[in-house]
Every structure is written in C-alpha cells, then in structure tokens.
C-alpha cells in the first residue's frame, strides 16, 4: 500500500522574500497557443541572515 500526502498553501512571496529577489517561469511549445499550469513548485534558500 502506498500512502501519499499533499499540502497546499497560498504564500504572498512579497511578504517573505527580499525585494531584490526575482522569480520567473518560462514554457513553450511548437504551437501558436498553449496553456501551461504550474502543478508543483519548490523554493529553497540558504541565504545567511541575522536572528532577532
């Protein structure tokens, strides 16, 4: 038996990443028009910072 778990959350990135961070997505096909959905995305950072 395989158990699968999922978690979904809406996170306003402007509230949690610095102003200078840029995030973008790009997709293409050979057709004139196509709809693309981002079904999964992850972000990891190890930028140093100070604790308060």
From Swiss-Prot:
<comment type="subunit">
    <text>Tetramer of two alpha and two beta chains.</text>
</comment>
<dbReference type="Pfam" id="PF00139">
    <property type="entry name" value="Lectin_legB"/>
</dbReference>
<dbReference type="InterPro" id="IPR001220">
    <property type="entry name" value="Legume_lectin_dom"/>
</dbReference>
<protein>
    <recommendedName>
        <fullName>Mitogenic lectin alpha chain</fullName>
    </recommendedName>
</protein>
<dbReference type="InterPro" id="IPR000985">
    <property type="entry name" value="Lectin_LegA_CS"/>
</dbReference>
<keyword id="KW-0430">Lectin</keyword>
<dbReference type="GO" id="GO:0030246">
    <property type="term" value="F:carbohydrate binding"/>
</dbReference>
<comment type="similarity">
    <text>Belongs to the leguminous lectin family.</text>
</comment>
<dbReference type="InterPro" id="IPR013320">
    <property type="entry name" value="ConA-like_dom_sf"/>
</dbReference>
